[in-house]
């Protein structure tokens, strides 16, 4: 272990690292984390995931409007939480699927222009350019670049997080 997140990839050293839960809507989760497709999605896997750079890369880019995500720092560990798809109770359908590590976080103020922002997002973003343009107008814009380190074989449901990990039900 060298301490360089890219050189050590996929190894993560959790000691002395901050850890967070990052919730992602199902429609974005599957495209972004192609190795974390749920069993109930497998029959549609070919339709859900195309052979594109953002699906195949270890680098992932996600847009958030949750103000506290701007406080993320390089090396922070993100537990990816796929939110409920509306097909049943969140207790069973919202799950932790993956572990990532923050590479870089940028807010709207870090970009000198719309073009600068679009160029930054171009390589690893799952989002359409029209959406990126629209979202750039939002002052709460946070762009999170992360490495996709682990797709969990056993998924943790919201119920498990509430009952066993004692995570607050009001957190998300």
Which residues make up each language-model segment?
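A generic structural signal for short beta-strands and their flanking turns/coil linkers
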Residues: 76, 96-98, 142
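Short coil-to-beta-strand transition motifs
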Residues: 89-101
């Amino acid at each position: 272990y060298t301490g360089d997140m890219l050189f050590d990839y996929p190894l993560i050293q959790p000691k002395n690292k901050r850890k967070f839960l990052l919730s992602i809507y199902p429609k974005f989760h599957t495209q972004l984390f192609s190795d974390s497709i749920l069993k109930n999605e497998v029959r549609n896997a070919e339709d859900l995931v195309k052979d594109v750079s953002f699906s195949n890369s270890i680098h992932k880019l996600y847009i958030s409007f949750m103000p506290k995500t701007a406080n993320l720092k390089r090396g922070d560990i993100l537990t990816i939480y796929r939110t409920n798809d509306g097909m049943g109770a969140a207790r069973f359908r919202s799950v932790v699927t993956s572990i990532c590590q923050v590479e870089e976080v940028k807010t709207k103020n870090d970009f000198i222009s719309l073009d600068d922002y679009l160029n930054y997002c171009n390589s690893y973003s799952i989002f359409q350019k029209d959406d990126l343009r629209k979202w750039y107008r939002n002052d709460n814009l946070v762009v999170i670049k992360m490495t996709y380190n682990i797709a969990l074989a056993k998924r943790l449901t919201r119920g498990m997080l509430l009952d066993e990990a004692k995570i607050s039900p009001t957190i998300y």
